[in-house]
Swiss-Prot record:
The keyword Ubl conjugation does not apply. NAD(+) binds at residues 184, 204, 209, 273-275, 297-299. It catalyses: keto-D-fructose + NADH + H(+) = D-sorbitol + NAD(+); xylitol + NAD(+) = D-xylulose + NADH + H(+); L-iditol + NAD(+) = keto-L-sorbose + NADH + H(+). It holds the Pfam family ADH_zinc_N. This is Sorbitol dehydrogenase. Its EC number is 1.1.1.-, 1.1.1.14, 1.1.1.9. The lineage of its organism: Eukaryota, Metazoa, Chordata, Craniata, Vertebrata. It is a peripheral membrane protein. The gene is Sord.
């Protein structure tokens, strides 16, 4: 493939709260272990929208212009001299977190916890919502012909579901509660079923999102209104016939985490995926006296190979998650759509010559 000419790298850049712009960035120079990618499909994540609206997520503050995007797939156009496993023309999915050093967390395989990690579209690191993007070749995964670019981009949220189910030790025959029917809740549902969960119930405020959960495999759905966490937990137990061994909380809402504690079977596990306020009130004694283990999830690690295999074997289907598509030139409109909650997953197509999935 011919190298891109200078000035062709259209990128979506956040400058601060409420300020995103399409700008031309330089084509990045490769290091010896890097690849240059022609981006194809990039999904909009809630964190992208949050950086646009607020200019920060917790301690991560946008202090200089930053390219957004971290759910991505593209085509290799150039490789660094040390790269042996990829070549120009290869289609790849991008794992956005790359350790900058081999620290204690990397040595035990939990590189997602390394404090100095590079992570796409987390200040100060640029993301990949652009025409051309440089990434570490070791964190680019070749896609089989049977897996589309959009499926490759969806490996990022799918990885959150895989990692959450691993942290919860979801296994054959388990009953599972998923709190939240957004993109992360939906992929968690898909993974839990693929890992052998016998019954999965999904709860959410939105009837339309619960309908999507039912469409893709939820055994039961419960629409939450003004019930107390105790009452919701009783409904969960009623539809399942017993309390779930594993609850995976994907909203971050205080009441939802409380529901997770009340709903989970004694000796079971509550996995907290959703990021809410730093301080929340929890019925901790209720968890302690019933030995409900509470585990956190921060991004993911060691999930891309499994995700590629699951998609290639058609073990699960993530295609229904994509509800809207926009060309890169209309990325601001795409973000408006995502902000309004009009779709489940909004996908941006970065290659002007290929708008296919």
């Amino acid at each position: 493939m011919a190298a891109p000419a200078k000035g062709e790298n259209l990128s979506l850049v956040v400058h601060g709260p409420g300020d995103i712009r399409l700008e031309n960035y330089p084509i990045p120079e490769l290091g010896p272990n890097d690849v240059l990618l022609k981006m194809h499909s990039v999904g909009i994540c809630g964190s992208d929208v949050h950086y646009w609206e607020h200019g920060r997520i917790g301690d991560f503050v946008v202090k200089k212009p930053m390219v957004l995007g971290h759910e991505a797939a593209g085509t290799v156009t150039k490789v660094g001299p040390m790269v042996k496993h990829l070549k120009p023309g290869d289609r790849v999915a991008i794992e956005p977190g790359v350790p900058r050093e081999i620290d204690e967390f990397c040595k035990i395989g939990r590189y997602n916890l390394t404090p100095s990690i590079f992570f796409c579209a987390t200040p100060p690191d640029d993301g990949n919502l652009c025409r051309f993007y440089k990434h570490s070749a070791d964190f680019c995964y070749k896609l089989p012909d049977s897996v589309t670019f959009e499926e490759g981009a969806l490996i990022e949220p799918l990885s959150v579901g895989i990692y959450a189910c691993r942290r919860g030790s979801v296994s054959l025959g388990n009953k599972v509660l998923v709190c939240g029917a957004g993109p992360i809740g939906i992929v968690t549902l898909l993974v839990a079923k693929a890992m052998g969960a016998s019954q999965v119930v999904v709860i959410d405020l939105s009837a339309s999102r619960l309908a999507k959960a039912k469409e893709v495999g939820a055994d039961f759905t419960i629409q939450v209104a003004k019930e107390t966490p105790h009452d919701i937990a009783k409904k969960v137990e009623s539809v399942l016939g017993s309390k779930p061994e594993v609850t995976i909380e994907c909203t971050g809402a205080e009441s939802s985490v409380q529901t997770g504690i009340y709903a989970t079977h004694s000796g079971g596990t509550l996995v907290v995926v959703g990021m809410g306020p730093e301080m929340i009130n929890l019925p901790l004694v209720h968890a302690a006296v019933r030995e409900v283990d509470i585990k956190g999830v921060f991004r993911y690690c060691n999930t891309w190979p499994m995700a590629v295999s699951m998609l290639a074997s058609k073990t699960l289907n993530v295609k229904p998650l994509v509800t809207h598509r926009f060309p890169l030139e209309k990325a601001v409109e795409a973000f408006e759509t995502a902000k309004k909650g009009l779709g489940l997953k909004v996908m941006i197509k970065c290659d002007p010559n290929d708008q296919n999935p």
